[in-house]
């Protein structure tokens, strides 16, 4: 039997797409990412660079006008394990060293920024199907990853360069200015690579963010514990390496090699892992689901719990560890600061009034509250992700009402952030109480200090719900609102912003616990604003179309 082979000629002018190398299309994707981030990218680059000279150095020149005042401040800082745990050590009494001491937190903030940026353009795009659509064009296997890396590496370098240039324009040593800028850029590059590796592990962007932030939280804890003690553990943390460069204190340039080598190794690992998986897949395989849904999944609240329980566990553990660190180092801070009234005034002003230990606890839990607010925003944004991922439409087409569906995710956000915050308060209270031998006396005060943060934490969830109902396309702007609040808190008083602007920051209205003059009025106002925004967002969601 003979067979006929039909050779179908291609239509004239038709060519099969030629992908070229694995990096084909990288520059085009980079331009796309720059366009998508044309607001957020310049914002965080400038926020993490410009204040170094205009706020930190300028404020130290005003508060500590001579070397003797700076020497007293530096001695007080180094005598306080709590201060070293929060911001790192200060290595001498020069204007540069004392001036950038609190900017040590910028190494953590740039890590947060690059993690969110990399995951937004890699795993989040794959999860939404955008990456698959792009890959249907002439784009190489590694173009997406390379574009995201170039974007974050470039932004990190720009942040360090702008910060260094600003410092060079002041009266501090040029070598220290360059060292701080390079160290800041190196921190961003390390965690850019961390996020790139995490993006290869799971099909879920939420899991990817959880892994990357778990690494960052571990790095921060190691750095904080190390700097509060002998300093040995700080060498196990990339955040510690950046501080060990010691700008303005006999710069140790060789330490930068640790960060650059780590970034290089992790970047190579990310490419190797990317080569071994398909678009949309992860190296950690998802467990197959059960044949039938359990009773919990038959209603929206159970589904919301199932979707978010992993995030709740990770964030709670992270805040609990931070609470343990803060609770264990707070005792004796008043004695350790000695008679330096300037430093006492700064710590008291940023944390409230009264005893310095209570003021430091208020400061520490304000930081915890801001982290919990980020967790609340993350959980509330699940509404937006479910809608844009077309999963909400399926649920709402059945017997589930819009109000019930929204309430399930909102309840998870409010309860989850409350649980994480209160457990961190319990951990800090136990550590503090055992240190002073008075658990029964200290635990209620510390837990109360944690609890009063909740109305401000919930405000960020309320803002997210309001945006989701009224302007769903702009729901992720809730992250920008949180960044604005944090910037006002960290920079507002130092930069001399008007009080009217400072009053917009919700954490500035948290009353002090344990001093005898507690007032609940600010908390009631915050709760009223929370309720109003949530009601407004829910009513708007009931009346608008579900986005497809």
From Swiss-Prot:
GO CC annotation: plasma membrane
Main subcellular localisation: membrane
Induction: Transcriptionally regulated by RaaS (Rv1219c). Expression increases in multidrug-resistant clinical strains (MDR-TB) compared to drug-susceptible strains.
Listed GO biological process terms: response to antibiotic
Transmembrane segments: 39-59, 99-119, 148-168, 178-198, 210-230, 253-273, 313-333, 359-379, 410-430, 450-470, 477-497, 521-541
Cysteine pairs bridged by disulfides in the record: none
Membrane topology: Multi-pass membrane protein
Cellular location(s): Cell inner membrane
Keywords noted in UniProt: Antibiotic resistance, Cell inner membrane, Cell membrane, Membrane, Transmembrane, Transmembrane helix
Chain's role: Probably part of the ABC transporter complex Rv1217c-Rv1218c involved in the resistance to a wide range of structurally unrelated drugs. Probably responsible for the translocation of the substrate across the membrane.
Subunit structure: The complex is probably composed of two ATP-binding proteins (Rv1218c) and a transmembrane protein (Rv1217c).
Protein name: Multidrug efflux system permease protein Rv1217c
Native source species: Mycobacterium tuberculosis (strain ATCC 25618 / H37Rv)
